[in-house]
Amino acid sequence: MSYSKKDDDGDESIFANVNQVTVTQDARAFNSSSISPRKSRRLLSKIAYLIYTGEHFQEKQATELFFGITKLFQHKDPSLRQFVYIIIKELSVVAEDVIMITSSIMKDTATGRETIYRPNAIRSLIRVIDANTVPAIERILTTGIVDPISAVASAALVSAYHLYPVAKDIVSRWNNEVQDAVTSHNVGRKVASSPFFTSTLGYTPNASGISQYHALGLLYRIRRHDSIAMNKLLQLLVSNLGTVSNSHAFVMLIRYISSLMDQNTQFRDQMVPFLHGWLKSKGDMVNLEVARNMVRLKNISDDDLQPVVSVLKIFLSSHRSATRFSAIRTLNELAMTRPHLVHSCNLNIESLITDVNRSIATYAITTLLKTGNDESVDRLMKQIVTFMSDISDNFKIIVVDAIRSLCLKFPRKQDSMLTFLSNILCDEGGYEFKRAAVDAISDMIKYIPESKERALAELCEFIEDCEYPKIAVRILSILGEEGPKASEPTRFIRYIYNRIMLENAIVRSAAVSALTKFGLNAEDKFVQRSVKVILTRCLEDADDEVRDRAAFSVKALEDRDAFLPVVKSDKIPSLPALERSLVIYISERKFGQGFDIKSVPVLSQEEIDAENLRIKKATTEVEFTEVTPAEDQNALASSNIETEFLNALESVSEFNEYGPVLKSSPSPIELTEQETEFVVKVVKHVFKDHLVVQFQLHNTLSEVILENAVVVSTPSTDDLVEECVVPAAIVSGEPVSIFVSFKFNDSVPYPLTTLTNTLQFTTKEIDIHTGEPEEEGYEDEYKIDDLDVSAGDFISPAYESNFDGLFDSLEHEASEVYVLSLLDSFRSTCSRVAELLQMQPLEGTENPTDKPVHVMKLSGKLVNGEKVLALVKMAHSKDGEGITIKVIARGESDSSVELVVGGIA
């Protein structure tokens, strides 16, 4: 064939004029007595083109096509048969009565059929059956799962995976066959001889063993809710490493091991040596996967991570870009939580700043920013400027996020960082990039008071030429909040006024709201009058939203004393609690009485700022970080914990008279191991005069139920007096709550004690034939771990912008010295003390330097609203064992400071 330019001009795509009408008409050829495989494949490719480009076939039309295509089963051409199965799978979603071709497909699943037919037939078979007909194909799939031919075994395993949601019990019965597919050296290791390979493909493919990967995925799905069975499987595979030969399966095995290591401390200790061994073998893909998963383990020691850092350091000099990228990205992730471990790699990382791959260079810079110190910041900032124009917006956002974190870590370097952020606002970039820069400047304004004046001025300059209305609205909101607090608030009014004159209605509305805050918060009468004049002019605006806001604002300025408490309220309802209360109010449908907003817990601005600061310091590049299924489930479960426990608490009428919940535990505390028959978690709820301990009990035994389950909780001191116990009537498979309420001793406002806990219940066995519990049961008890009531239960983190000034102004002071013998570094001491006291570290003091003495600043608010601050001075003990700390607390009362200094013991 000639491939001249003339031929190219006359060549037209077969998809040029394809539509549903012509395809449906042409499909009548499938009913003819003589079928041309070539023409049929051409027509099937047109149908596939329509489906994959989003064309939707009507049910009747799809059914006609579906049964027309089934006529092609009479032709034995392997390529045509493969295409038939592809289209059958796609049309089976829309067409009617697809189950009628089950027998035709099942013929191709027989072991004696052409090898090319069987995998495709198995995949198509599960698309045309329903849950009721799964038993009819059970033998086909179980035979396929243990088939020695790789394509057949993979097809059967993937099909079983898709069947699991609709036939969970049946697929679970195939547990032994699936485990054989993982551990056997015969299953899925061959490629059958077929004329199709030599005549059509021209070669015979190799057996990749990919069926082992599919089998491991299916086995995990079957066993994932049985941690004991999963533990045994993983230990079996680890002890016989030769069993897992496929690299993809090995990577999946590592991920499953990591997810279980986070849940089981004993299992983690057993697996760490194996992971260290795999760091030096099995190929780069496995090495990097081990490193990434070890970095993400929550409770792993620094010593266990040292081999990981050493291996990643070697990979940084690899000649393969993908390997260097994976290594630097993993180190970047480690630097977010343990920057001190990455210091040894800094020289290697600096060499990557000039890497031709700008993605690698970006991660190198951001990693160095996270591990840098005061001396290296300025040098790194100069290097960043040189390549910012060469990278995409996505990576620019990563750099900006790293700069933002660095601002919070080294507030003294705010001048150079603010200059950098201001310059990139003037550069070309998309909305997300500019928004990230504005958010970074906003954080500097909020958490670094020294930068406020200049940062606000930079935002005012940017807003003059801002092309994104959403960003303009964001900046106006910042100006409205922070501008009135500046030393010269009037300098910002001109920029806001320009927005009213020049921008669209959305921005004008935001400008009106910002001006209103200036008028309400300004003490200068001239400023109030000027703002009122501008707002009065807005009453004639063409947009009704602007007019409405202006009318409200003018009224607020005229009656300033009445509106000021509303506008300047520093108490904000807890949004999760507000949402939960509104849902309950709507579901009860008692609209005769109004919604009681006073029942919703409120948060102060300091508490909100402290939580926001904690989140920002813990932020990772979510867009570029993959999350394993186990991590994703854990995150989802964690987000629902507060609602789950508080809903159960609100359902108990005995606690209604206690008043609002002042504080709850930030996360459930486990009082038993995850693998025990009775799993108990606990959350502490603090009220004004009461402590309610909520025990969540999960009975994992399917053959017994528990009745009248209670927890006998005994305080170690007289500071708590038990008031009532709310038992769980029946405990079967679902978690239930047991409550124990204590009243505070009048003489001790903040009781610190230890609760000794014993679970008591009546056990009744389940009749295996009827599924009903036996009438007779027996009394039993189960010992669970003790629970400490500590200082952190009465303190919430609270952000304070002027720590030194407030510390000097507070009158009540107490101090105490402790030796923490189990800790060996300032970093671990900072983390432990902040966790015990539940106070907010300030000014980056939670990141110690290499100096021999370190001071950490902490801020918090007690449940009664009192502010309390603490200085924690620390030094290495003279004998070299542990860290010596001195806690100096200042607060609004003696009881508050005594609580803080006594909270470390």
From Swiss-Prot:
Q: Name one GO cellular component term.
A: endoplasmic reticulum-Golgi intermediate compartment
Q: How does it sit in the membrane?
A: Peripheral membrane protein
Q: Where are the HEAT repeats?
A: 265-302, 303-340, 374-412, 414-450, 525-563
Subcellular location, in the record's words?
Cytoplasm; Golgi apparatus membrane; Cytoplasmic vesicle, COPI-coated vesicle membrane
GO terms for MF: structural molecule activity
Q: Which parts of the sequence carry Phosphoserine?
A: S604
Q: How does it assemble?
A: Oligomeric complex that consists of at least the alpha, beta, beta', gamma, delta, epsilon and zeta subunits.
Q: Family per UniProt?
A: Belongs to the COPG family.
Provide the function of this protein: The coatomer is a cytosolic protein complex that binds to dilysine motifs and reversibly associates with Golgi non-clathrin-coated vesicles, which further mediate biosynthetic protein transport from the ER, via the Golgi up to the trans Golgi network. Coatomer complex is required for budding from Golgi membranes, and is essential for the retrograde Golgi-to-ER transport of dilysine-tagged proteins.
Name by which UniProt lists this protein: Probable coatomer subunit gamma
Q: What is the scientific name of the source organism? A: Schizosaccharomyces pombe (strain 972 / ATCC 24843) (Fission yeast)
Gene name of the encoded protein? sec21
